[in-house]
Amino acid sequence: MMEKIRLILLSSRPISWVNTAYPFGLAYLLNAGEIDWLFWLGIVFFLIPYNIAMYGINDVFDYESDIRNPRKGGVEGAVLPKSSHSTLLWASAISTIPFLVILFIFGTWMSSLWLTISVLAVIAYSAPKLRFKERPFIDALTSSTHFTSPALIGATITGTSPSAAMWIALGSFFLWGMASQILGAVQDVNADREANLSSIATVIGARGAIRLSVVLYLLAAVLVTTLPNPAWIIGIAILTYVFDAARFWNITDASCEQANRSWKVFLWLNYFVGAVITILLIAIHQI
């Protein structure tokens, strides 16, 4: 049993849990202005069960590609034996359904709409016949929805409407999510082609994809600087993603795996930028 739990948690990418829980918690706190039981319920859901489902479904149906991908098998993606696939799918359902029921019951119609979109995006990204991850450009839009929707749910679940400034911030976050998905796809161009999988990177090539990623990161940084001071500090923090990806501006399909160096930096940049945002918000609140 403990081994099964270990494999399930490994598949859920613990290093990336913060990418979904933090947006929900931050948006909830900014809009509701308080911490209550619903806040903690959402944090727990988007921290672990949500990621078990999102990455678990992906690992099951991407198995043939993952076994050909040298970077899979650690923090960047588990390669679970086929004997564990049914367990992983059951865990995805069992761990999420109770939370979803409560979030639907105690949420608003708007948060329920975003929650429905979020769940559908998680399933559609990897599930057979839908496979949005194999539909170029739709793959980036869907992946970004995985990370932006928790923030939208957090911002609307208490009945308070997001401000214009929050919508701008969410727009910047959505651009960041698209850029990040494209960056991740660059390193997998050859592995995906060998497995006959399509992605935005396999269609426009590694170089085109990395350059698009850089542009989207830059747009995200510019958009957030349109917010009142001191939002420009966050814009500067986002530029670290631009510099990280731009190092591989002239990458080729043959050398696409080199982009993994950028991806490894990206994983830790999330913590750095998250810390900058947190410290900035605390400072503003104290002022």
UniProtKB/Swiss-Prot annotation:
Disruption phenotype: Disruption mutant accumulates lycopene and shows altered carotenoid biosynthesis. Its EC number is 2.5.1.149. InterPro entries: Prenyltransferase_related, UbiA_prenyltransferase, UbiA_sf. The chain crosses the membrane at residues 15-35, 37-57, 97-117, 137-157, 166-186, 218-238, 265-285. One of its GO terms (molecular function) is transferase activity, transferring alkyl or aryl (other than methyl) groups. Pathway: Carotenoid biosynthesis. It catalyses: all-trans-lycopene + dimethylallyl diphosphate + A + H2O = nonaflavuxanthin + AH2 + diphosphate; nonaflavuxanthin + dimethylallyl diphosphate + A + H2O = flavuxanthin + AH2 + diphosphate. The gene is crtEb. Coiled coil: none annotated. The keyword Transmembrane helix applies. This is Lycopene elongase/hydratase. Catalyzes the elongation of the C(40) carotenoid all-trans-lycopene to the acyclic C(50) carotenoid flavuxanthin during decaprenoxanthin biosynthesis. The enzyme acts at both ends of the substrate, forming the C(50) carotenoid flavuxanthin via the C(45) intermediate nonaflavuxanthin. Belongs to the UbiA prenyltransferase family. The keyword Plastid does not apply. It is a multi-pass membrane protein. Keywords: Cell membrane, Membrane, Transferase, Transmembrane, Transmembrane helix. Pfam families: UbiA (PF01040). NCBIfam families: PRK13105.1. It is found in: Cell membrane. GO terms for cellular component: plasma membrane.
